[in-house]
Amino acid sequence: MTRKPSNHSTKRKKSQRGRAASKRPLIRCVIFDLDDTLYDCLGQRVRPAHRHAAEAMIAAGLKGSLDQVYRARLRAFHADPMLRHIDSEVIRHFGAADPDAVSRAAHDAYFNCPVGKLTLFRGALPLLHFLKKSGVRIFITTFGDVDTQQAKVAALGLTREPAIEKIYYADRAKRVTKESAFRQIQAETGIPADQILVVGDRPMSEIRAAKGLGMHAVRLRRGEFASQRPADAGERADHEIKNISQVRRLSFTFSAAE
């Protein structure tokens, strides 16, 4: 004969569940990075941009075939994802009559590669809609050439997405940085830092900025900067995930309630 749990036992279990739920940090605002966070930038943008740059380098006088130069750029990129020395390494390998002209051509082509059709990660839209339905305020911050980033956002259909409250563009001239965008979002929403979650892929960028401001940080470890290791505790996210859809299953309470 099965014994029914006592009222005391049932109440104790409910109390334990309540205490467990209360330990989950409340999140009222989520800030997403764009590249390699909401869509596959490495596959859809970075590799085509390197091919575009390889074509420009050859046109400017680099001595090599398109396939050779493209593969050399990818090898150099994996060794130096911050692009500090990639052009000089490729030029040194192949040779050119005017290295400066080739370097300028590569830089301009890489950062101005035409934006074609782009597709969000499969779980991105369902996550945005889940957060919106939960009453969470949603923002996007993205870094790079502003015109190019705006074209990416439009190609992904995010300018028409009602779940997104506002998109901030951090530029290369650093007139707007991700940290300043985070500060502005906090000031405009009035939401405490410990109720804001930042989701991104770069330890030295949005993760460091979020941690420095006392916000929660989740790193999506894939794409262009997947191999980058945190330099210190300030670049170490609270959680690491491999799929954007995993955000909703993390130990947070997503709600508009204070």
Label every PLM stretch briefly.
Residues 58, 64, 71-109:
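A metal-dependent, Asp-based hydrolase signature
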Residues 46, 120, 178:
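Conserved donor sugar-nucleotide recognition element shared by glycan-biosynthetic enzymes
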Residues 2-28, 125, 129-132, 139, ...:
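Asp-based, Mg2+/Mn2+-dependent phosphohydrolase catalytic module
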Residues 21-68:
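Active-site neighborhood of HAD-like aspartate-dependent phosphohydrolases
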Residues 41, 140-141:
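Small/polar loops that bind or transfer phosphate-bearing groups
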Residues 63, 96-97, 159, 192:
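Short coil/loop linkers at secondary-structure junctions
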Residues 109-117:
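Surface-exposed cleft-lining segments at the edges of enzyme active sites
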Residues 46-55, 83-88, 146, 150:
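An amphipathic alpha-helix signature
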